Structures are given as C-alpha cells and as structure tokens.
A protein has these predicted regions:
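C-terminal accessory helical subdomains adjacent to catalytic cores in phosphodiester-
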Residues: 1-15, 26-49, 56, 60-177
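Helix N-cap/beta->alpha junction signal
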Residues: 21-22
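Short, surface-exposed binding/anchoring microloops in extracellular/periplasmic proteins
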Residues: 18
Length: 177
C-alpha cells in the first residue's frame, strides 16, 4: 500500500506594495522591510521606486504597479515639499492608495528619527542627512548602523509617518492622522 501524501498547509499572505518617491525612500523602505518582515510573519511586502517627478507621478506609479499584482494594501512614501493637489488626493482615494508624507522630505523624516534638527528647506535636509550618512543614502546598508529596530520602535510611537510605515510592514493600514 502506497503512503498517502500529507497535504501541505499553506497560509495566505497579506500583500503590501509600497512605492517610494525616489532612491532614498526605496533604500529606507528596504531597510524597514529587512528588519520587520520575516519569514512566516504572514506578510509579503514589495518595495518599488517611482523615480521622483512629484506627487502625481508617484501616485500614478503606485496605480500602475498595483495593476500588475493583486495587493491587499498599496501605499506611497513621498515628500510634502511639493503640494499634494486635490487631483492627486482624489486619484489616491479612488485607487485606495495610502499616502504617507515625509515632512519636508524623506531626509527630514530620517533626521527626525535620529533626533537631529530638521531644517525647513528640503535642500538643507538633504545636505545635513547626506553628511550624517557619509553621503551614501541610496543603499539599504547605509541605514543598518544608525537606524536600529529598537530606535525605530521607540520613534514610531511619536512620529506619525514612521508609525504608518511600521504598520504597513505588519500588513496593517492605519487611519489618517
């Protein structure tokens, strides 16, 4: 008598697509994914890069990428230095895209996480942050030393944008603050 195969129990993963506005956003999101999304956690996170060009392009990139896959949650991380027009907000709402803003830019958010002073101008934030990371903010490895899981967990309690990103990494969608 032949052995009967034991059926493999498969779990359905919650799928999350997060689009970063540029290279820095993608590298930071990849770092978060590496820290928070582990095998067997029930979540599959995909990170993509919209390559800039403003909020409209980032939302369009999210919509295009979402059409190529069946994602439970679609979100974008983008700067707030350029205005989010009503048209951009409407498009995001219609396509169920969660918008996470980094004020005034992702470099400012990262400086805030580190407890550093955050200048009002995006260009100054970029200069300060690039100097802080030895000018290598476009690769995931640049974040390993300064952005530990313990620091991110602690700062996630007080920084709304980071709290949303950490929730997305867990497959949860937080209501807008």
């Amino acid at each position: 008598m032949a052995r009967r195969a034991i059926p493999v129990r498969r779990i359905v993963l919650k799928t999350v697509l997060i689009i970063g506005e540029g290279d820095t956003e993608k590298a930071f999101l990849d770092h978060l994914k590496r820290l928070y999304v582990t095998r067997g956690c029930g979540v599959a996170v995909t990170v993509r890069n919209a390559h800039g060009k403003g909020p409209g392009n980032v939302i369009d990139a999210a919509i295009r990428h979402a059409k190529n896959g069946d994602f439970d949650i679609v979100a974008v991380l983008m700067d707030t230095d350029l205005p989010w027009t009503d048209e951009v907000r409407k498009s995001a709402r219609e396509h169920r895209v969660c918008m996470v803003g980094a004020t005034p830019c992702v470099d400012g958010l990262l400086l805030q996480i580190l407890g550093e002073h955050v200048p009002e101008q995006s260009s100054r934030c970029k200069d300060f942050f690039h100097a802080r990371l030895d000018r290598k903010p476009f690769v995931r490895e640049a974040y390993e030393q300064d952005f530990s899981k313990a620091l991110l967990d602690e700062k996630g309690k007080t920084i709304p944008s980071l709290r949303k990103l950490l929730a997305l990494m867990a497959g949860q969608l937080l209501a807008s603050d």
